[in-house]
Structures are given as C-alpha cells and as structure tokens.
C-alpha cells in the first residue's frame, strides 16, 4: 500500500475494531486496513474499517465464514478476505456494488477491490 502512495494503514492483531462505535463491543481481526484516519483513536478503529482479513483455523470456520461475514457486511466493511492455510485458499468478499465473492489459491494474484491496481499473491508473502 505504501509503495503505491496509499493513504491506508495496515494494523495486525491485536487491534480493536469497534464496529458499532459503542466503546464496549469490539472484534480483533487478524489484519485490519483503515483508509480514513478519522476513524482511529488510542483504542483502535471506531466504525467499519475498509478491509479486514481473517485467517481461519479449524475451530473458527463458523465464526469466520458465517458470523463475522454477516457482522462485517452489515457494519459497512468494504472488503473481507478469509485466508484458509489448510486448503491454501482465499475467499474474498467485496460488499460494495455487486457484492461478489471469489475464491483464489495462494498462487493467484488476488486483486484488492478497495485499491485499484493493487493485488497480492499470498505465496509470495509466505516465501
């Protein structure tokens, strides 16, 4: 993102995201990307970040694929990725416009929908 002169900031876990802006209920995604600095304070992100990435584990399938998917979509998150290290796949959701869901392998160049012209190949990050 920085290489492309982007204004977005990346925050790895632990990083609190207060989806309801209530200072009580929050989630801690594995990776959070915030493009609006006004949403940030000393506690974390207030309101929906632009992009969330969750790394699924065997015990978190229901949480990541159902519960968090619903929470993030209804809260206004623009893009949500679920990374499955066992299957070496990434399920992407773009909640603006057509709300498409796509599945990619770790070897694919995965387009970042919120950031035109930017893509990520997971295998390159793990090398």
Residue spans of the language-model regions?
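C-terminal interaction segment
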Residues: 7-75, 82-127
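Short helix-capping segments at alpha-helix termini
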Residues: 1-5
């Amino acid at each position: 993102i920085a290489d492309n002169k982007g204004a977005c900031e990346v925050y790895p876990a632990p990083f609190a995201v207060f989806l309801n802006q209530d200072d009580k209920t929050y989630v801690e995604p594995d990776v959070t990307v915030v493009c609006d600095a006004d949403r940030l304070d000393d506690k974390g992100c207030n309101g929906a970040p632009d992009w969330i990435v969750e790394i699924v584990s065997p015990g978190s399938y229901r949480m990541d694929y159902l519960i968090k998917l619903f929470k993030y979509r209804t809260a206004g998150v623009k893009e949500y990725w679920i990374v499955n290290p066992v299957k070496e796949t990434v399920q992407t959701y773009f909640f603006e416009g057509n709300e498409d869901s796509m599945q990619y392998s770790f070897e694919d160049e995965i387009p970042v929908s919120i950031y035109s012209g930017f893509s990520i190949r997971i295998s390159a990050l793990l090398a």
